[in-house]
Amino acid sequence: MHVTIVYSTPTSQFSSSIFSATDDDTEHAAKEIDEVLHKKGIQTALIPLHSETIESQISAIKNTDCIFNLVEWTGSDLPHAMFACSLIETLGIPFTGATTLNYLFVSDKVYMKRMFDRMNIPTPKWQVFYSGKESADAELIFPSIVKPALHHCSIGLSRDMIVSKKEDVHKKVLLQMQRFAGHVFVEEFIEGREFHVAVLEREGKPFVLPPVEIVFKVTGTEAFLTYESRWDVDHPDYKQSEIYVPKTYEPRLM
């Protein structure tokens, strides 16, 4: 069996960003997957996708049984990811990961929030801002946090984006818009436990892997994964949380 591992590399715009560690992590993951597959006796090819040569690189993929898709461009680089996913779909080769349409849906948190609302799945109170001139809704609940809608991996999540009153919303929204391209949203901050839950498709149905809990050593509005607490090992915030994989789970969680 032969597997081709395709992964996104930092664009020229993002490679100089303070958030480039997220793309470095994609490369590390690709190499780890390559190593694991080799140990299982599977032949592999690693393809680091560059935004300037997406079409030629993907079109050149031949004689492989499966494409392991690790394309993870988001934010202003989202069009590159959409293009790459659409090309992978045209090859007629089985692939892992999202389809083009699915990638678009899950890359925009506002779209996901609307889908949850439509399906009556409860989520924290929220409001989207496209221009920064919108008035804050009276229904917003505080404290809230201001998030970029098109980024992942805690990009844009920081302590200074917590808002405790309606009068501060406009200032924080504009600041977030200056930092990142695209719309932002304000979401009620809810204290509680945080879990990472991976879901795979198995025989056409969702298959839930064991949850992993992020346990915080702080409380209140300090207890969430900022970019620094997730990626910067030298930052004080990094030591405020740890990963915990319990052997058993409370029935109410499952």
Question: Where in this protein do the model-derived segments appear?
Answer:
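ATP-binding N-terminal substructure of ATP-dependent carboxylate-amine bond-forming enzymes
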Residues: 1-94, 101, 107, 111, ...
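Active-site nucleotide/adenylate-binding loops and adjacent lid/helix of ATP-dependent enzymes
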Residues: 1-6, 61, 103-185, 191-193, ...
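Conserved protein kinase catalytic core
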Residues: 14, 75, 153, 194, ...
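Residue-level preference for long, well-ordered alpha-helices that form the structural scaffold
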Residues: 22-29, 165, 250-253
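Hydrophobic beta-strand scaffold residues
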Residues: 44, 94-95, 123, 144
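Phosphate-binding site of ATP-dependent enzymes
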Residues: 166-252
